[in-house]
UniProtKB/Swiss-Prot annotation:
Lipid attachment site numbers (S-geranylgeranyl cysteine): 209
Regulation of catalytic or functional activity: Alternates between an inactive form bound to GDP and an active form bound to GTP. Activated by a guanine nucleotide-exchange factor (GEF) and inactivated by a GTPase-activating protein (GAP).
Modified residues annotated as Cysteine methyl ester in this record: 209
Binding site for GTP: 15-22, 62-66, 121-124
Name of the protein this chain belongs to: Ras-like protein
Protein family (similarity comment): Belongs to the small GTPase superfamily. Ras family.
CDD domains, alphabetized: H_N_K_Ras_like
Taxon lineage: Eukaryota, Fungi, Dikarya, Ascomycota, Pezizomycotina
Catalyses which reaction(s): GTP + H2O = GDP + phosphate + H(+)
Topology term for the membrane: Lipid-anchor
SMART domains: RAB (SM00175), RAN (SM00176), RAS (SM00173), RHO (SM00174)
Length: 212
């Protein structure tokens, strides 16, 4: 039975321009694929759902990928509870930009770790792939977070990507609560340093399976 307590989660979708951040967000919220590319400055969406028998209100902020909005992006990062770092599997450059976004989040949050998930989007375009699944998984391993490949167009793993970051926020908050209750002090930035443990089964679940 789902809990009736409504917890709001502030999720921020970040990544380079044209990687499909808006398409993923709108597919989650409206179950609709947006075909045309219209660069985003800032859009906010809300959706109520049940994740692991707990009611959740997802407050999703879709951010600009263009470099000229980087100062505005830092403002979003201050309020976000969890981040989806999105690249396109068809763009090596967008993949390489993910490291910069991750470092920016940790700097703004003043943490060594914060809830994130690495998302390789456009996995329906296998013939145009420039970034292997192994590379995406390795980057996520380096970050200590989960990796998942998605397709907004084919609605592959869209819900899973957003639900997984909510699960990671819950796990992180429990660790923080335990850390505070334990009265620990001194760890680098005032919080637990433990990264997300991702099992081999969970790694496999992040793959992109296209039904022909």
């Amino acid at each position: 039975m789902a809990s009736k307590f409504l917890r709001e989660y502030k999720l921020v979708v970040v990544g380079g321009g044209g990687v499909g951040k808006s398409c993923l967000t709108i597919q989650l919220i409206q179950s609709h694929f947006v075909d045309e590319y219209d660069p985003t400055i800032e859009d906010s969406y809300r959706k109520q759902c049940v994740i692991d028998e707990e009611v959740a209100l997802l407050d999703v902020l879709d951010t600009a990928g263009q470099e000229e909005y980087s100062a505005m992006r830092e403002q979003y990062m201050r309020t976000g509870e969890g981040f989806l770092l999105v690249y396109s599997i068809t763009s090596r450059q967008s993949f390489e930009e993910i490291m910069t976004f991750q470092q920016q989040i940790l700097r703004v949050k003043d943490k060594d770790y914060f809830p994130i998930i690495v998302v390789g989007n456009k996995c329906d375009l296998e013939g145009e792939r420039q970034v292997s699944k192994q590379e995406g998984q390795q980057l996520a391993d380096d970050f200590g977070c989960k990796f998942i490949e998605t397709s907004a167009k084919s609605r592959i793993n869209v819900d899973n990507a957003f639900y997984d970051i909510v699960r990671e926020i819950r796990r992180y908050n429990k660790e923080m609560a335990g850390y505070t209750a334990g009265g620990a002090s001194g760890a680098n930035n005032g919080g637990p340093q433990g990264k997300m443990e991702v099992s081999e089964g969970e790694k496999e679940s992040g793959c992109c399976c296209i039904l022909m």
